[in-house]
Amino acid sequence: MATPPKRRAVEATAEKVLRYEAFISDVLQRDLQKVLDHRDKVYEQLAKYLQLRNVIERLQEANHSELYMQVDLGCNFFVDTVVPDTSRIYVALGYGFFLELTLAEALKFIDRKSSLLTELSDNLTKDSMNIKAHIHMLLEGLRELQGLQNFPETQH
C-alpha cells in the first residue's frame, strides 16, 4: 500500500528537522565551544603578560639593584630568594624558548605581544558571533519548517 503524499511530506520534514538539529548540536555548538575555549586561553595569556608588565614597571620605579622575593617551586611551596641584578629579565617567548632582555626591551616585547593577543581575541570573538548567528539562523529555519509561531524572546 502506498504512503499518502501528505504523510510523505510530513516524514520528509521530520527528517530534515532531525538533520538540522543534529548539525546544530554536533557541528555548530561544538565549533562554538572550541572557539570560546581558545579565546579564554588567549585571555589567560594576555592577563599573564599584563601582570608581567606591572612587575617590570614596579622594578623600574623601585630602581633597586637587588630584589628579595619568594619563588613558588610548585604545589604552593615557596622559598625565599635574592635576585642580585634586576636590570635584565628572562621572558618566555613560547614553545619553551626564553630570552634574556633588559627591562625596556621586555616592555616593548610585552606591548607587541599584548597587541597581537588582543587582535587574536577580537578575531575569535567575531568568529564566535558568526557561529552564534548561524545557529540562530538555523533555529529560525527550523521554526519555519515546523510551522511554529514567533515567541517573544526572553531577555537575559
Swiss-Prot record:
Protein name, UniProt field: Protein UXT
Taxonomic superkingdom: Eukaryota
Pfam family for this entry, one: Prefoldin
Molecular function GO labels: chromatin binding; transcription corepressor activity
Keywords, in A-Z order: Activator, Chaperone, Cytoplasm, Cytoskeleton, Nucleus, Repressor, Transcription, Transcription regulation
Coiled-coil residue spans: none
CDD domains xrefs: Prefoldin_UXT
Entry GO terms, CC: centrosome; chromatin; cytoplasm; cytosol; mediator complex; nucleus; spindle pole
GO aspect biological process, one term: negative regulation of transcription by RNA polymerase II
UniProt xrefs under InterPro entries: Prefoldin, Prefoldin_subunit_alpha, UXT
Subunit structure comment from the entry: Homohexamer. Component of the PAQosome complex which is responsible for the biogenesis of several protein complexes and which consists of R2TP complex members RUVBL1, RUVBL2, RPAP3 and PIH1D1, URI complex members PFDN2, PFDN6, PDRG1, UXT and URI1 as well as ASDURF, POLR2E and DNAAF10/WDR92. Interacts with LRPPRC. Interacts with androgen receptor AR (via N-terminus). Interacts with estrogen receptor ESR1; the interaction relocalizes ESR1 to the cytoplasm.
Species, as recorded: Bos taurus
tRNA processing is among the record's keywords: no
The protein's role, per its UniProt record: Involved in gene transcription regulation. Acts in concert with the corepressor URI1 to regulate androgen receptor AR-mediated transcription. Together with URI1, associates with chromatin to the NKX3-1 promoter region. Negatively regulates the transcriptional activity of the estrogen receptor ESR1 by inducing its translocation into the cytoplasm. May act as nuclear chaperone that facilitates the formation of the NF-kappa-B enhanceosome and thus positively regulates NF-kappa-B transcription activity.
Subcellular location: Cytoplasm; Nucleus; Cytoplasm, Cytoskeleton, Microtubule organizing center, Centrosome; Cytoplasm, Cytoskeleton, Spindle pole
SUPFAM superfamilies membership: Prefoldin
Family that this chain belongs to: Belongs to the UXT family.
